[in-house]
Amino acid sequence: MLVKAGEENAGLMDIGGGDLPKQQAVLDVRAGSSVLGRARAFGGLHGILPWLYPTIHDVFPFYLAILVQTSGNPQALRLLARSCIEPHAVRTDLERLVWDKPRACSEQSADFPVGRAWSAPNLVRRMCALNQDLVSSARSEEAALVFIARGKAGCRVISWQSIHDCLAEFLHRHALASFHLSD
């Protein structure tokens, strides 16, 4: 089944010029309806999407873990830049995560020990590696941001509404008390 899925993805990626195509693009090619029919066996184009690209459901756990570690403003951290990791000014055993706070027109930072696998800076590195292939497809103003995901609308930074939706799912799944992120 996995080999067939890989072959089907290759055909779809050929039709899409290296990207997962829209349904109409598949139908526009000869034998497109049969390709689409075979794709349906794997959940259709939308079902194949998470096999190829990080989606909001992949990105949200990184966002939440970094948010908890930094105690940052949730809206400001949503717009965290890929260039946010800096060496500490004085100590070599620390590194700094720096982000903009647009409404306050200021910068905020938090320091973390170097080399900790699950520290916020290393989570940023992991997230950037995971979604590196999406950067070239993202909007120019969003390409430099950490929390880019692929969805129905293309490659975008995760939306504030999507974060709230994922948080509600997370709280429900883990039977946690309800709380809301506020800006």
Per-segment meaning from a language model:
Residues 2-8, 22-183:
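Extended accessory and catalytic-adjacent subdomains in large enzymes
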